[in-house]
UniProtKB/Swiss-Prot annotation:
It comes from Arabidopsis thaliana (Mouse-ear cress). It is found in: Mitochondrion outer membrane. This is Mitochondrial import receptor subunit TOM9-2. One of its GO terms (molecular function) is protein-transporting ATPase activity. Forms part of the preprotein translocase complex of the outer mitochondrial membrane (TOM complex) which consists of at least 6 different proteins (TOM5, TOM6, TOM7, TOM20, TOM22/TOM9 and TOM40). The chain crosses the membrane at residues 52-69. Its main location: mitochondrion. Residues 2-51 are cytoplasmic. The keyword Protein transport applies.
Length: 99
């Protein structure tokens, strides 16, 4: 016995041009334009964010990293001076550098 398909008759098959009518409708073309605009804005935002990240990163490397290195060096020098003073038996006194 053959299986009976529901909606497969002449009237149940639908219009063969329904996809063409839907894809050519105004709402679909507006959606495509909106999607294209969203992609364009996303690309511009990504490009400008990358530029800002590059500027921030290079500024950090040029200005902040040498400062951190110098502060660490100064802390090491102070620690060595305190160790030497304690080995010599003198009470540790705060040294005033740069005056």
């Amino acid at each position: 016995m053959a299986a009976k398909r529901i909606g497969a008759g002449k009237s149940g098959g639908g219009d063969p041009n329904i996809l063409a009518r839907i894809s050519n409708s105004e709402i679909v073309s507006q959606g495509r334009r909106a999607a294209g605009d969203a992609v364009e804005v996303s690309k511009k935002l990504l490009r400008s964010t990358g530029k800002a990240a590059w500027i921030a990163g290079t500024t950090f490397l040029i200005l902040v990293v040498p400062l951190i290195i110098e502060m660490d060096r100064e802390a090491q020098i102070n620690e060595i001076e305190l160790q030497q003073a304690s080995l010599l038996g003198a009470p540790p006194s705060p040294m005033q550098r740069g005056l």
